[in-house]
Amino acid sequence: MKKHTSLLLAALLAFGTSFAGNPDRAGSAGASQLLINPWAASNGLAGSNMASVKGLESTFLNVAGLAFVERNELAFANSMYLGGTGIALNSLGFATKVGGSGVLGLSVTSMSLGDIPITTEDLPEGGIGSFSPAFSNIGVTYSKSFSNSIYGGLTMRIVSESISNVRASGVCFDAGIRYVTGENDGLRFGIALRNVGAPMRYAGDGLTVTATPQGADEALTVFQRSEKYELPSLVNIGVAVDVVSNDNTVVTATGQFVSNSFTKDQFGGGLEANLGERLVLRGGYLWEQGLITGGQDVTTAYTGPAGGIGLNVPAGEGATLKLDYSYRTTNPFNGTHTLGVKISL
């Protein structure tokens, strides 16, 4: 088993290296919705808990964490993305135990961009209605515990982006591994490869133009071909360690490195404190080059800090209700607020 795991880790690292790009490629990929974390608890740590995240939230960071679902889990989250823009994210997921060591999960994320005025060459000021882009992705995940120390998972995700007369769709895959060791499983390592798939292309009636060529008597309809665009593939490597662990308090330090194919690499860290059985406090920071010094080379609206709080509430025999809130600072805009509800049955 250790030999097979080592080979799989080496394959993920080698495959991921081929995707490692540079910031000069920023803006040349599409389907950027795949880079937005829709879940509340992990946003409170700026996503730095990829090596320790469990349950449905792991379907975004490291799918190996889904293997820790004990029976059934249902989750919902709502994000007010970049406050003031009117953009909202809604995410819904369900996971269930399959067999003795496997977990099957389904997650759906939709992104609402609000109503955008329709403008044309003849009516550049609008006044003829509005349109609403529809961005969504649906993921099917299978995760498995191979031993008491080794966990792995794979996700197939269908991606869709459209307006009324133009649409693009595609399929991508995520894979992840987690290794757990140390006293009371207090040390965890993770690696994940995300958003790997074939290029996507927009198509539809919106790419046609009807015009009458000079000297012609009849109008012609011309179809304009769109260019393909790549998906924002990345490799994520993380570690988590319980720095305090006793009957009443568990404090976990988390860290991660993200190698992005189409933007700057990122480093993140965070602390999660479980105080008793009810209260959870979270704080994190995500750094990339140029974030602290500012200037024209800043390529993200996020300024780094994140924080959150969670409450665990008993919900009957064998069931737990978890309420989470997180906030991430941005400049400009008014930050990103995320509320989440999870029920373990």
What are these regions, as identified by a protein language model?
Residues 10-11, 70:
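Short, linear, compositionally biased motifs with a strong N-terminal bias
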Residues 19-345:
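Subset of outer-membrane beta-barrel
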Residues 2-10:
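Sec-dependent signal peptide recognition
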Residues 1-2, 341:
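Generic cytosolic/nucleocytoplasmic N-terminal low-complexity/intrinsically disordered segments
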